[in-house]
Each structure stands twice: as C-alpha cells, then as structure tokens.
Amino acid sequence: MVISSCDDNQIFDQYQSLPKYWNKDSVKTFSFVAPDTINSYNLYVNLRNNNDYKYSNLMLIVEMDYPNGKAVKDTLEYRMANPQGEFLGTGFTDVKENKLWYKGYEEPFVFSESGKYTVGVQQAMRENGQVSGITNLEGITDVGFRIERTK
C-alpha cells in the first residue's frame, strides 16, 4: 500500500506500509524524477513507529541510485527515544511520525543529474554485541521518503 500527502513545500512524499515487522533483507524503494538541477532540496526518510519498537536508536542503510548508474550508500543512525524512553516522534496515539534528515542538513543538496532517481531504505539494526543483525525488526509500521523545497 502506498500513501501520499500534500503541502506547499513538498516535491515528493510517499510511504510504504510494513507487515508486523521489517525484515533485514527488505529494501523499501522510492523512485522519482529530479525536479531540477539548479535549486537545493531537503531530503528525509520518514518513519512511523509504535510501542512495539524496543530501541532508543535506529540504524538504516540508505542508497541513492542516480540516473547515470552511480550509487551512493550511507549508513545512518537516528535517535528514536529520549533517555527516559519516550519516543521523539510526533503524534498523540501510540503511532509516532518521525521525519529524519537524509540530505540537505549539513550543506544544500542539489540534484546533479536530470532524470529518474531511486532511493532504497533498509534497516540495519543489531543487538549489542551481535554481528548478524536483527532479522525481523518490530515496531516500524511505515517507511517513507520525502523531498522538500528549501525555505
């Protein structure tokens, strides 16, 4: 299921729902055409989590495939809860919305090529002291990708 939303700054905003868990081999992909190669944009990974999420952080592997075939892969860590264990996302129910910076926060992000890009998002969580990773991560209900105009 794909869910989209709309506002003035939005260029692209799409979610994909997950089953009861997020398998470590499941890559959620989002394809879009670059709006232009002149202006700068903010790029986000959006997540929804519920109380089944048992961790204070989240590790993701995010890969951007460019139109010319170049691929840039980043391993990213996000804080999901404060030291008291309260989730940092927004929302009044047990489902929290998280808007996590991907590109544009340290320096302006400009699409360097015209054409179709694909972004893949994969969970890379591990238990302390474990190498193999968490096979089925519970508590993440939706994964999304968003592009906004800079203000």
Predicted segments with their positions:
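Solvent-exposed serine/threonine-rich low-complexity stretches and specific carbohydrate-binding patches
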Residues: 15-16, 74-82
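Solvent-exposed strand-loop boundary residues in beta-sheet-rich modules
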Residues: 66-70, 84, 151
